[in-house]
Amino acid sequence: MKQFIDFIPLLLFFIVYKLDPRVIDLAGHELTFGGIYSATAVLIISSVVVYGAIFISQRKLEKSQWLTLVACLVFGSLTLAFHSETFLKWKAPVVNWLFALAFIGSHFIGDRLLIKRIMGHALTLPEPVWTRLNVAWIVFFLFCGAANLFVAFTFQDYWVDFKVFGSLGMTVLFLVAQGIYLSRHLHDADPTTPKTED
């Protein structure tokens, strides 16, 4: 459910982006609605509304949600202020690389890896598995950032499609692969499960 709520602003961005630009009358002012700049404005507004509602209802936002919201406000505002979509194209790469940096930093700062802080309350795994899992997330975020950057500046007609559905597809595939990997190791840290020799 949380992932769906986080996806709402991006989905609205995609819908508005795909609209044919049309002129609408708003309080006597003619505005063009549709295309990248209208979509960016919708992304900013919907992000503030969605994360604002979450903050009001839960009295907090997760760090990842704060990062996503701030990045949306910064890169979205720059896109509108300078009327250049280049700024927005950098949003996904920068956010992904900052996530990767956070996972990398947890190898050197703190007493637990970031992935263990996130999932440790629900899973019991050997330390080597936690380490491999944390590294896998680092690689995933680095790859997603690079893929978004490559598509944004190489295939400009498709970068919004990739931003929404390509990134979602990569995330789903990674989570499925992670689930398969974890299913092989969940018993390793369970003392009630007898170990078998290969």
Swiss-Prot record:
Claim: Isomerase is one of the keywords in the record: no
Keyword Cytoplasm: no
InterPro entries referenced in this protein's UniProt entry, alphabetically: YciB
GO cellular-component term (any): plasma membrane
Compartmental location: Cell inner membrane
Membrane-related topology note: Multi-pass membrane protein
One Pfam entry name: IspA
TM stretches of this protein: 36-56, 67-87, 90-110, 135-155, 162-182
Alphabetically ordered keywords of this record: Cell inner membrane, Cell membrane, Membrane, Transmembrane, Transmembrane helix
NCBIfam families for the chain: ispZ, PRK00259.1-3, PRK00259.1-5
Family note: Belongs to the YciB family.
Protein role: Plays a role in cell envelope biogenesis, maintenance of cell envelope integrity and membrane homeostasis.
Protein name as annotated: Inner membrane-spanning protein YciB
Organism: Pseudomonas fluorescens (strain SBW25)
Gene: yciB
